[in-house]
């Protein structure tokens, strides 16, 4: 079975070697047919602490690394991000 790959935005980079990535998807409402945004947050492994808040990244499913981490960051998608750091 191939590994799942998702694209999302880094919403937190405060922890060591971990980033939180928010992945949004669009679903159609069952009754009304309206397109709705749904999102989910994933904890992903970032070995070198190189990804910052606001960047768009691609994450890949891996074997569990901890209680929450089962994903790792594989690449940066958007290099023109605007980080929220002061």
Swiss-Prot record:
It holds the Pfam family Ribosomal_S17. Keywords: Ribonucleoprotein, Ribosomal protein, RNA-binding, rRNA-binding. GO terms for biological process: translation. GO terms for molecular function: rRNA binding; structural constituent of ribosome. Gene3D superfamilies: Nucleic acid-binding proteins. SUPFAM superfamilies: Nucleic acid-binding proteins. The keyword rRNA-binding applies. InterPro entries: NA-bd_OB-fold (IPR012340), Ribosomal_uS17 (IPR000266), Ribosomal_uS17_bact/chlr (IPR019984). GO terms for cellular component: cytosolic small ribosomal subunit. One of the primary rRNA binding proteins, it binds specifically to the 5'-end of 16S ribosomal RNA. Belongs to the universal ribosomal protein uS17 family. Part of the 30S ribosomal subunit. This is Small ribosomal subunit protein uS17. It comes from Rhizorhabdus wittichii (strain DSM 6014 / CCUG 31198 / JCM 15750 / NBRC 105917 / EY 4224 / RW1).
